Swiss-Prot record:
HAMAP family the UniProt entry points to: Ribosomal_bL35
NCBIfam families: rpmI_bact (TIGR00001)
Short name of any one Pfam family annotated for the protein: Ribosomal_L35p
Family: Belongs to the bacterial ribosomal protein bL35 family.
Keywords tagged on the record: Ribonucleoprotein, Ribosomal protein
GO biological process: translation
GO function term, MF aspect, one: structural constituent of ribosome
Primary gene name: rpmI
Region (Disordered) residue spans: 22-64
Name the record gives this protein: Large ribosomal subunit protein bL35
Organism expressing this protein natively: Mesomycoplasma hyopneumoniae (strain 7448)
Residue stretches of biased makeup (Basic residues): 22-31
Cellular component, GO annotation: cytosolic large ribosomal subunit
Length: 64
């Protein structure tokens, strides 16, 4: 008998990307609306994707 293989969560699959070194990239939060109250610097910096923290990555491993 083989071990059960769990499916990857589809919602997560659409939101993250794993780099070649195994780190996880994701987009910034708080970008969809209410942007007029944020500074230009906040809006500009949130365009780029960022790497996930190690503490979050440990929780995320179960979903991948």
């Amino acid at each position: 008998m083989s071990k059960i293989k769990f499916k990857t969560k589809s919602a997560l699959k659409k939101r993250i990307k794993v780099t070649g070194t195994g780190k996880v990239k994701h987009g910034h939060a708080y970008r969809s609306h209410l942007a007029q109250s944020k500074t230009t610097k906040q809006k500009r910096q949130s365009r780029k994707s960022t790497l996930m923290n190690n503490s979050d990555f440990k929780r995320l491993k179960k979903l991948i």
